[in-house]
Structure formats: C-alpha cells, structure tokens
Amino acid sequence: MRMESIAPFEIQPVADGVATLITVTRAGTTRRYRIPTNQSQHYALFHRELARDFGTRKPDVGNAPSVEEDTPEPNWRPLILDNLSPRTTAGYGDPAVLKTEDGYFLVATSNDAPDAFPILHSHDLESWTHRGFVFPEGEAPEWTAQGRKVGDFWAPEMAKCGDEYWLVYTARQPSHALAIGLAKAPHPTGPWQDIGHPLISAHAINTADLGDDSTQPVLSGGVIDSHIFIDGGGERYLFWKRDTNGVWPRPLARLLRQRPELIAQLFSKEADRRTAAFAATIGPWSDTRRPMERFSLMQPLMEAVLDNWVHVKEVLGATDGAEMIVDAMSTPIHAQRLSEDGALIGEDRIVLLNDQDWEGHLIEGPWVTHQQGRYWMFYAGNDFGTPAYSIGVAVADHPLGPYTKQTDPLLKSTRSWWAPGHASVAPGLDGQPQLFFHAFFPGSGGYNAFRALLTTPLVFTADSVTTLSHADQPAELVMA
C-alpha cells in the first residue's frame, strides 16, 4: 500500500462546557460529532461513530472475548453486584480484602468520585455493609488533586502493621502525575491520617508538548498500584508499578504526525492505519485535556498497537526518536523494604517486567502471598478496560525474587465476566486461600464502568497454583 493512499484527516475540536464538539474531514467527507461528557463510554460511542463514517477501527470495549463454545464457565463466585452506597459510583475495582478478628474489610478504587476509597465489611463474604470512606469529600490529603471529576484515587490496600492499620494508595497530584500515599489508622474504618506527603512520586514525564511549567498540569505517568507484603518474620516490603503505559500514546501520535510514513510500516490493516492517522491529527488537542480524556482519545491507537504488539515494538525499536516511546511501553513492578515507621529502606529493585505477549504494554496490581514455602505474585496485564485484561502469576523463593512467570494467564475473560483483574488473596471462611478480583459485566468496560467483586478458591503446591476454573474440573497451572 502506498503512503499517499492514507488520506490525512482535518479536525476542528471545540470545548462546549463539559462537552466536546469535533468536526472531522477526510477525502471530501465531513462529519460533526458531539461528545457530551469526558466519560469513557461517550468517547467509545464517538469512536464507533468515527469507525462507521471514516473506516477507523472500532473500539475493543464492548467486543466479546474469544471463548470456545464448549468451554465451561469458571467457578467464580460473585460477591458484590451493585454499588452499596449512593456515593460509590463505579463499583469495586482493584479490590483489596483483609481478614481481621472482626471479619473481612474491603477497600477499592473510587476513580474521580468526590469520596475516596469505599470501605466495606462482611462477616461471611456474602453480606457486605458500606462502612464509610477512607477520605470523605473535602478530607483528602493536601498533596492530592481534589474536586469532583478532578482528583483520581486508585488501588488502595490495607495491611495490619503492628498495632496499626496502614493504607497505601494511588492519587493524582495537581501536576497530573500519579503518586503513592500512605495513611494510618487504629481501625480499618479509621479515622485515617495521611503522612502528609507522597511516599513515592517518580517517573513523571511531560508528554503534553506544552513546555515545562511546574505550575501547570502537564505531567503524565508516575507510580501506581502499591502493595504491602509482611513476611513471617515481620519484614515489610512495598511493591508498586511504574505507570508509564499512559505516557507513550501521545508521543507516538506526535511521531506519526511528524513522520507519517511510519504508519504503513507499523500497521498492515487499513482500519489501523486510518486510526493512527486520526490519532496523529487529534494529538495536539489531546495534549490540552485531562488525563483520562487523553487516554480515551488515544484508546483506539493503543488497541491497534496491542493487536500488532511484537511488530510495532520491533519497528519502533529501530526508529530514531522513538526511544522514550519504547521505554514507556515497559511498566516494571518495583519492590523495596519498609521500616517499622513506614519509610522506604534499602535498595529499590525491579522484580517483574511485562515481557510476555499477552501482557502487552503493561503489568500492574501486584499482590504477594506466602504459600507452601514460596512467594506467589499475582498481577494483571494488558488494557484494563477491554476483555484482553487478565490475571497472571509468578513465583519466587524470596519476596524480592527472582520471580518465574507461568506462560499463560491464570484468569482471563469468559462469556459471563470480562477483564478479570487486580487480585488480592485472603483466607476464606475455611481458612484456605481465596483470590478476590474485579470484573466487568459482559458488554461493559472502561473508566468509571461498574466493576463487580468476585472470588475463587486457590490451591497451592510447591510448583503450581490451582484455581477451580470450572465447576467440576480443577485447572492446574505449573510454573515454567
């Protein structure tokens, strides 16, 4: 295919309050669109209409996973299927379950809702009660970006540390970069007292092409998905992820705008090429938007890259000027010791990389559990808002590794539940380990879509982890 056949787009976007009006012209055809809000479902509808009118790719959100017809449904037990408080808006994503002498406590992501991190309680894992929020509206730490549809609060997790409860979490800073915070309380329901500053703030990058200005929200990236693991001897470890998977799409779009000949080198399908051309054109407008709007505008380009993952990385790896893009496509899991007062001590180590094809441009959501004398890390991979998102597992003989991955996901999308991810492990009522995780209802996905809480039993040996994948057939996954 000759490059001149990839006709360019002309785009005129205009902000209209919370809505966006976009006029798109290509090859003599003009269409006008209105995106009513910054929510992901409205952007997904826009991209579907764009695909209908201009032949770009349809968004993966809403596309059913590929599942063989005779594949039995897994033995995943739904625990929470509705918001248990009118102030909880998107369910219970990134669920962290802690078993205490007073039953089970759950904390979960709240995204950009005014009240950060719902706290739930259950005695039997069946009936759950909303017990408040870690940071109710107006009480979030001063170092975080705050306000309705402004702040972002993700992936909280409680741990019992001595006589206190600690909560590590992710919050967006006023610069737009994500950071990890630490709060402490005498009880899982609080009151929670933040330490007053980020515990970790790193890997923030200016990708907005708007110039460096510390007073402006131009940064992307940062750190996310923190997890505290306490070993049998009382040693404390903090795990987290370098969050650069949202960093590379707009620089890639900028590179394609500057060097349009790369589009045909990266993509073979016409729909993907047109998608890349559109992303290249809308890029400057995307730079002016809030982080999750940027993400939504670039989502189809990201999906085109993931569908051509190995080839795209190979081409970009040999392309001058793409070094930062390629580096940002790696989202390593880090780990470091924690002192008794919550300070980071010792060496920061990378313990896991997204180096398997199914993981695509990211791994995240680490959770370590000690079973059968070994350390098992559960993690999520691929795009959280699509059915490609899955749960993987790796094993090591020390909390800091080296970890050996299994080659295939432990849990992946089914006909009944899409995008299982960000798991935690806690003893069930029988004392045996259970995996707790979130998933979307079929046909749903993306930022602020409802995520349900599910669970499934786990069985460990020295060399394998077994989940009751089907109601009557255990599936054993042996480590490579």
Enumerate the predicted regions with their spans:
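Carbohydrate-active catalytic/glycan-binding domains of CAZyme proteins
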Residues: R2-A480
